[in-house]
């Protein structure tokens, strides 16, 4: 099985039964990011970008699936550490050009407030946080 196909299958399984903040099927988010990427490495990392944070998958288990060290380094960079503030996380993402590109696309997708039918105050606060991060990464 090709690595991109394998990555999509893992992402679909990892995000099974998950919904985004707009109530949509979550897997659509990483798929949208994947479609914005240029190289296969970028596409694989984009579709897997939330798998380590949001499922039982780890960088080590993804390594056993045969993903390249480049993809794994991007995924590690895109995974927020337990004791890390959001701002520290964004500063770390800046150091990896591929992770930076994916995180910018992630933030842009997450800032599409029109997907939420009736945005609440918490949605607007989250949007402000994402916008600050987007500006820091641009």
Segment roles from a protein language model:
Residues 1-138:
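Active-site helical microenvironments for divalent-metal-assisted chemistry
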């Amino acid at each position: 099985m090709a690595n991109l196909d394998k990555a999509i299958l893992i992402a679909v399984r990892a995000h099974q039964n998950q919904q985004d903040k707009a109530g949509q099927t979550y897997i659509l988010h990483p798929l949208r990011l994947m479609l914005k990427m240029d190289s296969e490495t970028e596409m694989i990392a984009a579709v897997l970008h939330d798998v380590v944070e949001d499922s039982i998958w780890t960088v080590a288990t993804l390594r056993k699936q045969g993903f390249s060290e480049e993809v794994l380094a991007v995924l590690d960079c895109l995974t927020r550490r337990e004791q890390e503030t959001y701002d520290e996380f964004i500063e770390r993402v800046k150091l990896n050009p591929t992770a930076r590109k994916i995180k910018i696309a992630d933030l842009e997708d997450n800032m599409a407030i029109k997907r939420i039918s009736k945005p609440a105050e918490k949605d607007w606060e989250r949007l402000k946080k994402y916008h600050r991060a987007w500006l820091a990464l641009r």
